[in-house]
Amino acid sequence: MKKSLVTGMLLLFTLALWTSGDLALGTQLQKQLTQESTLEKVLKRGTLRVGMSTFVPWAMKDKTGKLIGFEIDVATRLAQDMGVEVEFVPTKWAGIIPALLTGKFDVIIGGMGVLPKRHLKVNFSIPYDYTGMSMVANQQHAKGFNRLEDFNHRDVVIAVRLGSTAATAAKKSMPNATLRQFDDESQAYQEVLNGKAHAVVGSAPTPAFYALKYPDRLFLPLKETFTKEPIGIAVRKGDFDTLTFFNSWIRFVEADGWLQERKHYWFETRDWETRVK
């Protein structure tokens, strides 16, 4: 009886050691993860480094060379609410995810569509915007075209930005067309303006802006967008503290009306055009 009691006490003591050890390890791991999170690094550094690429009206330069646009406003407001400065890191779109993964910047805020293929490499916040793909075409070369099927031929050239969801949408919707890809979206639009491509696929409302700007050379062949995709903030995988903060922040700026006001200004008006001309 005495031997059994001693054995039982030893088992309880051993179990207690295991439990306390697990708790200590868990606390230590949680502390380590918090210290290593992007959120903590940004707060400690005092600067939020944002990876982005220029495309109108999400991110572009004004007359003085300063970056402006919807994504610029989003990143600037986010940094302000965090109590830090913002630093923009212009990056070619095709290499923007690898640059995030290697630590060139903290987050991607650049109109990035939340795609399953991208989700394998990075984590995304909840959507802060939704966009769809649209087209603008050359009046001479695409005369009479008003359906996706009209562009789905090998002799039709579609211009897109390299590595973009526009490229993915074009390949899926017009698999037979010849795709011509560019590092900068403005180059894709210039290709159509120069008559070297039939059309360009891009996120709405940019194609409509170009059609309005060059009514003698361009037109909108489709009445509506032909895709719809959510836009989120991209962060490195495993960084759940940062992701949770971004999700809470997005809900906050949606609730106070700021996000909708910025969308209206950049996507539903053309008041900003005087700042870039």
Predicted regions and their residues:
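Extended ligand-binding regions for polar small-molecule ligands
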Residues: 27-36, 73-81, 139-142, 149, ...
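Short helix-initiation/N-cap motifs at beta->coil->alpha
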Residues: 36, 72, 87-98, 145, ...
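Bilobed "Venus flytrap"/periplasmic-binding protein-like clamshell domains
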Residues: 49-57, 67-80, 134-187, 204-206, ...
